[in-house]
């Protein structure tokens, strides 16, 4: 038995190399070589080895190309910061929280400024109409001292309750086994002087259940993080916190009408806003002041149960306009012959504002073109405090 027959893979490998390097041979190769290559190429073993060699060469080139791309591509990108996960997604990144020092307040402003908790709105008594706006707090993670025995320390504004519940959760995370202690909330016995937000249910004095005064500086910091509008490390015995009024939060963000206000339908019928439905066509106004009928496609802010403060504007003709303080009203300036927009609570006497003429047809059959629903409206409200001048904002 010869060598070629005893080692078949050696013969196949040599022929494969010959086939791959065929272009390097001269055209004057012998017929015996051609016949040998032809005969071996017909063999299945030869075809398999040729395919393997070609595949290995392709894989080698592909590996080199991928390695080159992995080196070059990172150089073509610039670093960028992305938004983090929202609330409830993933774990919160640990932050270094620094405790407040004695007599420190955040923000470092008067409590009654608009940038803090805002001005006083009046004492709330049990027989006051606003008393029903106070809500009890039955959070089991909060201890209420309730020295009076009347449950008054559990009563507070909705915003104060919301922030207090957040703070209670933070206290349990910061000091396991320790709970938040509320020593004073709504006060009906006038123990806090003539001017105090305790009388409106917008302020609380707090401590920890173990009465450890070394924790109070960090407790004040946790109150700031919980969202209280004004926090003061007022005493070694407790922390004082207060919030904006519920009415100022809602009425200064959106402009609304009362549910009893009416809208003129295309059919000529006047319908209360509280009874409007999606699809009703109501009289509105275009940018150039022309009256048109527009279809109701969405209610951006509709709450028929919410109690709200409103402003009433009376004209010499007997018309009455009832809107929230932050509602924009079309005001006519005779001197400059210009139409501007002013917040309702900033309109003064002898001001001309735009009303519909009862004799006009309101635009006939003309229909307004819908431009779609602006889903980003709430985002614009949130960034307005950072991008708009102070004179443009309703604070």
From Swiss-Prot:
Annotated stretches, region: Disordered: 26-46
Lipidation (N-palmitoyl cysteine): 83
Binding site for Ca(2+) 2: 148, 184, 187, 189
Source organism, top-level taxon: Eukaryota
Subunit architecture: Interacts with shf.
UniProt similarity note: Belongs to the hedgehog family.
Listed name of the protein: Protein hedgehog
Organism of derivation: Drosophila simulans
